[in-house]
C-alpha cells in the first residue's frame, strides 16, 4: 500500500506557482501627448532572460527606465517580487535599485577613474568591505568579463565593446538580482557582439541572474532569449517563448525577421547584400 501524503506534502503540491520577479501589467505612458507604450503586459520569472525586440522608437528602452524608476507610467502596474514600485518615493526606489541594475548603452562609466576604480566604486559604497576584500572582488569581476589587460586604463581609451564589458563588471559589483541591458550590441562589430552575448549567457548560467535585454539584433536575441516581447507601434505584438516568436505568422513579426535576415557587407563597395546563414 502507498502511504498517504502528509499535510505538508499536500501544501507543497497545491502551492501557487512562484510569483514572477518582474511583472508589467497593462502599462501605458505618453510623452507630450504621444503614446509610447500602450497597455503593455509581460512578466519574467527568476533566472529567465527576456529580450525586448522591435524597431527604433517603439518604446523598448522606456520599459527599462520605468523598471528603474526613472519614469513613471501613466497607467498600469509594475511589480518587483510582488512589490508595487509605481507609487514608491525616490528613497524607496533606491532600495529597489540595489536589487536591479542597468547597463547603459554608453556604459555610464566615470571618465576620471580607471577601469579598476570604476568597478571598485559600488563595492566601496557598500561600506562593509575592507580594501583587501574590495580589490579581491574587483580582480574577480574584471577577470569574469575579460578585462584584465585594461585595469589601469581610463574609459576614454577603451573601445565601445570594452566599455560595455567593464560596465557589466561594475553592475555586477552591486550584487543585483536582475540586470537590465540597453542595446548592448549597438555600435559594436559582430565579433564583439558575440563576445558580449557569450558573457551575458555565462553570467546567467554561472550566477543565475534574471536579465532583460533590449535589442534590435535578432541574432543576439536568438542566443539569449527564454522569452521575447515584440513591440510594434507601442503595443505588445507578441509575448512568449522564443520558439513561438520565430514561428509566428504575424505580418509585422515576419517583416521584422525578414529585414533582419539581411546584413550589409563589412566594407562599402559593389558587393551585394548577403543573407544570414
Q: Predicted regions span which residues?
A:
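Helix-to-loop junction immediately C-terminal to a conserved catalytic motif
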Residues: 68
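Conserved ABC ATPase "signature" region
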Residues: 83-84, 131-149
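Short coil-to-helix segment of the ABC ATPase nucleotide-binding domain corresponding to the Q-loop/switch region
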Residues: 113-121
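Conserved ABC ATPase signature
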Residues: 154-158, 162
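Conserved catalytic motifs of ABC-family nucleotide-binding domains
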Residues: 175
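Catalytic Walker B motif of ABC-type/P-loop ATPase nucleotide-binding domains
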Residues: 179-182
